[in-house]
Regions:
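Conserved acidic catalytic loop of the alpha/beta-hydrolase fold
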Residues: 82-100
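Conserved HGGG/HGGXW glycine-rich cap/lid loop of the alpha/beta-hydrolase fold
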Residues: 7-71
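Short, glycine/charged-enriched secondary-structure capping and boundary segments
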Residues: 42-45, 74-77, 116-117
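Active-site phosphate/pyrophosphate- and oxyanion-stabilizing loops and adjacent acidic/basic residues
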Residues: 47, 51, 89, 113
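Short, hydrophobic/aromatic-rich segments at coil-to-beta transitions
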Residues: 1-6
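Conserved hydrolase catalytic core segment
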Residues: 98-136
Length: 136
């Protein structure tokens, strides 16, 4: 079953998000460059991955601004990492998550690192996959 999609406000932009699972840990999954919270559940392997994460946590997923079901942005105003970090914070606020483990994949890992450094009190743990802190 696909979780209900809701929207958080981040500045003037609406950010699509979903919450599934009832575990004791809030886990925010930060996707890579492209995502779609509803279509993710249609790909069997990816859906299995999300279900596994939700089996031990309250899993919070979202589409970054300009992707998936979140509001579009003009091509000449692509979002900065800081704006996308604010989107992550807005989603956490919308679901009343005071502290969460943040799991970022690819570009989502860079975003997760920035969030953890900016909001250490709101970050229980940081997990990254396929990410880098500095391009060399």
């Amino acid at each position: 079953m696909v979780p209900q999609t809701r929207y958080a406000r981040s500045g003037k932009v609406h950010i699509a998000y979903q919450v599934t699972g009832e575990g004791p840990l809030d886990l925010v999954f930060v996707p890579g460059w492209v995502s779609h919270v509803e279509l993710s559940w249609e790909e069997p392997t990816y859906a299995s991955f999300l279900r596994r994460l939700a089996s031990f946590s309250r899993l919070i997923t979202f589409d970054k601004r300009g992707t998936g079901l979140s509001d579009r942005v003009p091509d000449d105003q692509l979002p900065t990492l800081e704006e996308r970090m604010d989107d992550l914070r807005a989603v956490m606020d919308a679901v009343d998550s005071q502290r969460a483990a943040v799991f970022g994949v690819s570009e989502g890992g860079n975003l997760s690192m920035l969030f953890a450094a900016t909001y250490p009190a709101r970050t229980v743990a940081l997990v990254t996959a396929g990410s880098f802190a500095k391009r060399v």
